[in-house]
Amino acid sequence: MIELSHVTKTFGGATRALDDLTLTVPQGAVYGLVGSNGAGKTTAIRHITGIFRQDSGSVTIGGLPVYENPAVKSRIGYIPDDLGVFGGGTLRELAAFYRTMYPRFDAKRYAALRDVFRLDEATPLRRFSKGMQKHAAFWLTLSLRPDYLVLDEPVDGLDPVMRRQIWSLALEDVAGYGTTVLVSSHNLRELEDICDHVGIMHMGHMLLERSLSDLQDNFVKVQLVTENPLPQSLQILHESALGRVQTLILRGDPQTVADELAASAPMLCDLLPLSLEEIFIYELGGTGYDVKNLVL
């Protein structure tokens, strides 16, 4: 389990990047970390991987602190958004380095993945395209057989075939080895296909965090036609109208919403599920965040 409890981090004495952040990734989960631009997602990830030390609060993996703890860090596979950390070495040189630094490095898996990624192991990574560098990063990181896989915008720039291949490999590790995955991405449609838990951040703190199924069961879109007032008990996040048809985005489970709407004797009442992207937009809209600034 990955846990951040009441974590605060300030840079330059003024900019508070994390503000009392609490985050929990259950063991064996695939957790999608999403949020507004500048929400603090990458800063949170750099605490989880032990790169940053928090000003206050705690950061633990498996109940143990991460910062300056090599034993815990050796169980983490991390792919950052900026792959400049890999420097100018070749894949063969980096694989040899990983083999000495990570006792869990699986040489057999590294060899097996050669047919998946098909990269020249003698070419310096700096000569690779951004997409090829991502391939190399996944090849090396998946060869670690990590207990915890932490990914920051991991498949940005990859073609659809390779994206599917990489997610398939990662999910095989979840199913076969109980790997815990945390992935930060702006591609909410893709996260919805692979994640079972979601956390939504804004301005350094967590807006909400729960399983994806619970999250989707607590928001509903309604299209209705009624001549009567709507019940005051409805938690309306957004409403619009086209002619006589009203469209409402509501917080609440579908059955409760349906029962409440029945009191207004609607002539038409259709309940529709919301996508993760829609939940994200309307949840952040409630904080005053301008929807036009969202990057999805």
Predicted stretch roles:
Residues V220-L296:
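Short, charged/small-residue-rich alpha-helical element at the C-terminal edge
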Residues T90, S211, L272-S275:
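Short loop/turn segments at beta->alpha junctions
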Residues A14-R16, G28-V30, H205, P229, ...:
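Generic "edge-of-domain/loop-turn" microfeature
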